[in-house]
Curated annotation (Swiss-Prot):
WD repeats lie at residues 101-142, 144-182, 203-246, 353-392. It is found in: Nucleus. The keyword rRNA processing applies. Transmembrane segments: none annotated. It comes from Mycosarcoma maydis (Corn smut fungus). GO terms for cellular component: nuclear pre-replicative complex; rixosome complex. The gene is IPI3. Component of the RIX1 complex, composed of IPI1, RIX1/IPI2 and IPI3 in a 1:2:2 stoichiometry. The complex interacts (via RIX1) with MDN1 (via its hexameric AAA ATPase ring) and the pre-60S ribosome particles. Keywords: Nucleus, Repeat, Ribosome biogenesis, rRNA processing, WD repeat. This is Pre-rRNA-processing protein IPI3. SMART domains: WD40. It comes from the Eukaryota. It holds the Pfam family WD40. The lineage of its organism: Eukaryota, Fungi, Dikarya, Basidiomycota, Ustilaginomycotina. PANTHER family: WD REPEAT-CONTAINING PROTEIN 18 (PTHR18763:SF0), WD-REPEAT PROTEIN 18 (PTHR18763). Component of the RIX1 complex required for processing of ITS2 sequences from 35S pre-rRNA.
Amino acid sequence: MASSSSAASLFATECLLYSTASSSTLVGSMGLTTVAAPSSTSALFTFKGVSDPAFHSVTVIPTSPNPAISGTGGLIFQLESNKAALNIFSWQRDHLLQRIILPSKLSCIACSPNGDLVAGGSFDGRILLWQIATGDLLASFDAHYRSVTVLKWTCDGAGLLTGSEDARILVWSLAGLLAPHDQTSSSITSSEHNPAPYCTLADHNLAITDLDISSGRFPHQAMVLSSSSDASVKLWDLRTRSLLSTFVFEQPIHRVVLDCTERFFFAATAPTSSDNLVYRIDLFRKRDASSRMVETKQATTGSQFDFVTDELRGASSVEAHGFGSAAGPTTERIPSARDVAHRAESNGSSIISIREPISSMCLSTNSTSLLVGSVAGNLFVIDVSNSQVVRTVSLLGNAKVSAISDKNAVTNLMVLPKPRDLLGHWETLSSSGTGSSMSGSGGVGGAGAPVGIPVRPIASSFGHHVLASEEDRLSKPYLTRISGNKTTLAFDEHNVDSFIDPEWDSHLVSSELLGRSTSALLSPSQTQSGAPPSTSAIHAQAALEAERLQRENKLLRSQLHQAKAINDEMWSRLVQDRLSVNQVDSE
C-alpha cells in the first residue's frame, strides 16, 4: 500500500505568493512560500528588484499544466508604485525579466485566466486592455469618475469587473471590450467611443474596496461579492443583474473572500477601524430546532398532539440564506463583538479577532485555511473549521523589530499550486542520459544543466494608443471561444447559454419559441410540407438571410454617410454666413 506521503506527492504543493510594502527603513518584497509551513526566512522563492507593490498591484499567469507540449512558464506582473511602469517576473529566475513603460500610472492590474490579456485601471477612472503577446492596446476608455480600486476577471475569462472610488461596480463582457463598434451605431461616425457595460452595480454609497467572484460561467452562473467603505458587503447575481443580499457591519470592510463552494464568506475590517476583526458569514444555516423538529397538530376530536417532522427523520435541516427572496433583496445586520445581546441570537456569523490591523486576506484552495496579512508584515494562519489562529509568521524576513513599522503592510496574498517551472524544481532539469533527472529518484543517468520550460511570449512594449480606424482594429483579430466546451457549433444546436449575450436568457424562452425561430428561416413551401428541414437547407436559408442583412446594412451605412455629409455642409455654411455677417457689422 502506498504511503500517504507518496500519495501527496502526486498533487502540487499549495503555495502562497505574498508581497509587502516599502517603508523608510525596509524595502518592499515579494516571495513564494508554502501554505502548510509559511516562512519568509526560508521561502521557496524570493524575487529581487521588487518596487513597493501596492494593493491589487500583483497578478499571476499560471504555468501551463499541459505536459504533452512541455507547457509554458508562468509570469508575475507587478506595478511600480507611483510610476508608469510594469515589472514582469518569471518563476525561472529571481531577477526582473522585463520592464514595460505604461502610458500612465495605474492603480490596479489583473491578467485574464488564460494569460492572453492584461487589464489595468488608472487613478482617473480609465480602463486599459492589452494583448500580452503583441502589446496591442485593445481598449482604452473612461469607465469611472474616480480612481479604479480593483479589477477581477471571471473564472472563464469572459467577463471583467471593475470597482472604483465612485461606489460603482461595472461588469464588462470580453466581446464588448474587444468589439465596441458592434454595440452602437455611433461608431459609424466616430472612431473613438466607449464600450457599453454588461451591467452596472450601483447600490454602495462609498468606495469599493474589494471584489470576489464565484466559479461559475459568465454571466449565467456567476455571483459577485463586493465590499465597500460604507460598512456593507453585497451579494449580486450577474445573470439577472440584481442585488441578492446586503450584509451591514459596524465598521468599514476592507477585504472580502468567498468560499469556493459558496458556503460562506469572510469579511475583514479596514486598517483604520478601531477593532481588527474578521467576520465569517454562513450562507447556509441550520433552521431553528423548535420550528423544524416538532409541530403541533389538532386532531378531529379537538385534542392537540405533537409529532416529529420530516427534518428530524433525516431530511435537510439547512436552508440557504443571503441569496435573496421572492420579495426582493434581503438585508441582514451583523452585530459587532461588543453587542453581546445580539451576538447570542446570531447563529449565522462568527468573529475572529486579530491583534494587528488587517491589510490583506485570502483562502486556501480547499477552504481549510484562512490567510490574513497585517499592516506590520505578519501573516496569520487561521483554521477555518474552528476559527482559531494556528500560526503567526513574519513575512519581513530577518528584519529587526525596531525597523518594522505599520507601513510594511502585506499588500497582496494569492494561493496557487507550486509552479512546475519554479527555479530549482525537478521539472526544470533535463536528463543527459537515460536515467531520471528527478532529485532523489534513483536514476542512473547523470542530470544535465537546468533547462527552463518555455516562457510565454511577451511584447517588448505595450501600446499607448488604440488603433483609430476600424480597418486597422479588425486587421489584428483576437480569437476568443464563444461555444462552451465544444470546438464547433452547429446551426441547429440551440445552446444559447454558451454565447455571451447581455440580453438573452434561455431560461426565459420556451421551446415553442425556439422552434419558431428555426422555422422562420425556412421558405413557406418547406413549412407547409411538414417534412423536417435538412441541415443543408437551413444553412442555405441562413446564408441568404445573412446576405440580405448585409446588403441592407450597407445601404443604411451609405445613407447615413450621405446624411452626415449634408449636415456637415449645412453647418459649415451656417458658420461661414454667421462669421461674414459679424465681420460686416464690425466694419
